[in-house]
Amino acid sequence: MFSQLFLKWLSEHFVVTIVLLSLIVPLRAFETLIRRWRLSRAQGCQGAASKVPVKDPIIGFDFLYKVLFEKSPERYLHSTWEAFKEMGTTYVEKRWSWQAVYTCDPQNIKQILATASEDFDLPEFRTSVIGPIFGQGIFVLSGHAWKHARAVLRQSFRKDNPAPFLETLERNFQAFVKRVPTDGSEVDLQPLFLALTMDVSTEFLMGHSTNMLSDKKDHTREQQFVDDYMICSEEIIQQMQLGPLHCLKSNRAAKRAKKRVYAYLDTFVEESLSSPKDGSENNFLTDMMATVSDRKGLSDHILHILLASRDTTSGLLGNLFFFLAKKPHIFAKLRYEVLKVAGEDPPTASQLRDMTYLKWCVNESLRLHPVIPTNARIAVRDTTIPRGGGIDGKSPLFISKGTAMFYNVYAMHRNEGAFGPKTEEFIPERWQDLRPGWGYLPFNGGARACIGQQYALLETHYVVARMAQTYKLLESRDDKEWMELYALALCSKNGARVSVSK
């Protein structure tokens, strides 16, 4: 009855109704402005210390041109570091249609990932780029779906006894050694590391290996999968670099590669499910089969886990041995330690923990070339970060809902205040007594920190130790400097071209 009377009154007072409706938007905008002002004042926020000068303040076509044409793909990460040196550790790029904050400040990154992580979520331009190519796996999920997938993955990675995993590593390492000539001829270790980590990851997580290092089968199908996977990975990164403008880019080759990737996965999953089982503990595939009802969803999760377990470890190994080959005195020092601790026998997990210099070398490679060098979040509500405001950039900065937050680990790892001088050089000794805290973030941080971190480090430490035991000399056959190939995980564009001798 009341609603009918109210509607009748509105119809009889049409002009008043229009006026009232027209006031709603400005009143809400004013209320938002006041609320944000109060939050900003309460937190002591000041205006951004550094803002990017823009030519197109509406859509940002000058930003699009800069990303597509002004930055060399092999120097993209270096250019971001140069931008921070020019603009400061936190700066703002503001348009009428969108706003982004770029930071390499450890305090801000800690705020985004841990202290106020509930204020931030995965950005749409990440989920809408990765999702259509690699599906709805753990790296694009949020909320309950993400927690569930992470719980299943944690169960797969939680191995109380590392001995069976080390046995898997040793068996695959012996297949790896057969592919490495010792007559002084050149070999690119990077694709071999890719094959090694692919075989280990699939056997460990799915109970069925791709056997890419086996000399008893044709690897055409597996190599096509690896090539297609890399095409898709590079396309994802190129689109993500465009941020909110990613929809303006399209790649037919990547779409064709995606179809072949899923066709391979469908076949491989069938082979894994039908392969003989020895009654051992469950793996990721069997755990996911119990919770994922459709084959597409299963393939999505597998693709994302391959990124976490294969790409990152192989990229780390390739980057590390690029520099070890360039610096034979470091490799000699590493080899001396490994032989002193473990002799010539395959090392145990306990012995690996005692190899201090080995861990320094791995840490230094992760510092210099973090396998996931940049990442992003979006503010889901009005919030603040502790640095970036005021003239000196040391005051809090207000972050409005919808602001894209790009945090750069690659640049953060070049902070001389945390890591000492010559941060562009590979110097493992810098890790003696070094405690960088949130200034060192090779595996992300907070609730979304890499769940397979210990798995990846154990695999890396083992392979590095076995390489040091197996080969007396490691020499570079590449006279060029390290160049980036920024796919979903960072690796050397020129590989790791070396010669070895026993």
Question: Which positions does each model-derived feature cover?
Answer:
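C-terminal, well-structured subdomains that either form a transmembrane helix-short loop-helix hairpin
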Residues: H301-H304, R310, S395, S400-A404, ...
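Conserved cytochrome P450 K-helix/beta-meander segment immediately N-terminal to the heme-binding cysteine loop
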Residues: V371, G393, K401, F406-L434
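Hydrophobic, well-ordered secondary-structure elements that form the walls
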Residues: L334, S365, G402, F426, ...
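N-terminal membrane-proximal hinge/A-helix region immediately C-terminal to the signal-anchor transmembrane segment
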Residues: F2-H148, A163, E167-K178, L196, ...
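Short, small-residue alpha-helix embedded
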Residues: T312-A325, V463
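Cytochrome P450 heme-thiolate monooxygenase catalytic core
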Residues: V19, L122-S128, P164-L317, K333
